[in-house]
Amino acid sequence: MKKGIHPELKPTTFVCGCGNTFTLLSTKGGTVYLEVCNQCHPFYAGKLKIKPAYYEMLAEFEGGKKEE
């Protein structure tokens, strides 16, 4: 790699609203505040609720429409 053309990476602390914190390398540096992370997002935390309309559409799709 060429020297002097790549940005400097600094340790950056990411703080979530749920209290989870983690540190990564980033060009920004300092602290970044997040609304959600993998610990509190419903999809990753297993709290995602699928609405009944989804099941209705799925049943219609799997059953197929009868053409007359």
Swiss-Prot record:
Transmembrane regions listed in the UniProt entry: none
Annotated GO MF terms: metal ion binding; rRNA binding; structural constituent of ribosome
Gene Ontology CC annotations of this record: ribonucleoprotein complex; ribosome
Cofactor binding remark: Binds 1 zinc ion per subunit.
Binding site for Zn(2+): 16, 18, 37, 40
One Pfam family hit: Ribosomal_L31
Membrane in keyword set: no
Presence of the UniProt keyword Nucleotide-binding in the record: no
Full protein name: Large ribosomal subunit protein bL31
Lineage: Bacteria, Pseudomonadati, Aquificota, Aquificia, Aquificales
Gene name as annotated: rpmE
